[in-house]
Amino acid sequence: MELHGVRTLEDDSAPKQITTVNMSVIGLVGTAPDAASGTAATLSTGSSLLDNQIVFTATAAGTAGNQLQVRAVAGEADSSAGAETGADFEDGALTITLGTDAEGVVDVSAADVVAAVNALMFDTEDMGIDAALPDGMVGDGVAAPFSLMALQGGEDDPFPLYTPALIAGSRNQAKKLGYSGTLYDDMNDILNQVGAQVIVVRVDTDEDEEAQRANILQGIESLQLGPSTLNYQPRILIAPEWSTDDGVGKALESMAARCRAIAYLDSPSMATPAEVVRRGQRYGARVELLRPRINVVSDLTGKTRGRPYSAAAAGHRVRIDSTKGYWWSKSNQVVLGFSSLEQVDSFMIGDETCVANQLNQANVSTLVQLDGFRHWGNRLCTDDPQWRFEAVRRTMDAIEDSIQLSMTKEYLDAPISKSLGVSMLSSINSYLRQQMTGGVIIGGSAWLDDELNTVASLAAGVVYINVAVTPKSPAEQIVIKYAINKNTGQVSLAA
């Protein structure tokens, strides 16, 4: 429509800022049978001194109970008799009608009010309200009217079964897992390294080994719900007491591929180096196989006991992310939180035949003693030289996911035009330059693919962009050449 005036238009074709995704989120699966449960919302009315105190409680735990309300009103007496006591629940509000005598004076006891409320039948799918007298009270006191009041104090279950829950580096949160099962000890190993963000999936405990394995597998499947329920995507996947099992290991590997994550797998207690190496040959470029088991002093009993290494390794990875960057290898960095190793692999600097080096060459990581216990090994379970380093894999994951997220949020479904292509390329290239300046990568660039971006493909709504990145590999081997130079520092023997 034509306008006699000034029309305002906004140009949104400028390049968009790309932010690097969070690579330091751990996904943890395990058991915690004594984990804290949710709390039901409550409301207390009346007085214990008057023997008319009543406690109203939501029929289910959770914050939804905080939306419930209660009120008590005096009934209206007719000419012949007083009002009867009754209760009605509608739209989250409980209305109690207090019985009266013929003159309209409330004469119903607190005990009778409790009986009237509890006589209500609630739909099992809906939240209702129960009433009770405090312990030791008879409830003979006369109930008093009160205006609409809300129940309070309802809290959701902090760790519902098979549901991702976030522990944001807090030991107080971790204690809500309870001390039995596996998850508390796993969290302790992680938090001994750093205050990490951990997506925890609690599963049922079962004495039957196969049933327990099935529970763990179901918990691993639940990790993929992290982005949609918590807005966090797990990038380091562990199931410490269970990942010695290849069924669990393969499930973690599969989930790692879906989440663009790395799975850390533990080795069985007292496994030989040869057994560990043979097992590693079953896995690929999303798995790091850990040879050692560590001896940790319990913060509950003070006793030393053997533990899988994967939880400590995951916390160690996050600590290196925080102090140096996610593009750094965690190898040759001191690991915290344990006193000794279950088995010691021979290690000597420069010795190709020591067990630690042989494990590394077979794509297995271990721990060595070198001014503290150091993680020793850069590689994932693949022989592909381009993808065998964990640091390279995680760098590419970070860049790929960051660009993908930005393209999805800012450009997907926008009309295809020259300005769209220019803006997308400018955004990606600007981001890659930032990564170069920050020391994350050596180089990178993006360009439109002229061969694939045909008239037909563009008409079909498909745009092709090529991105080339040069990540930084860790200096896994440093070769130093020495020679004796006889022409310098000559010593004169003349008198």
Residues of each region from the PLM?
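Surface-exposed assembly/interface segments
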Residues: M1-A495
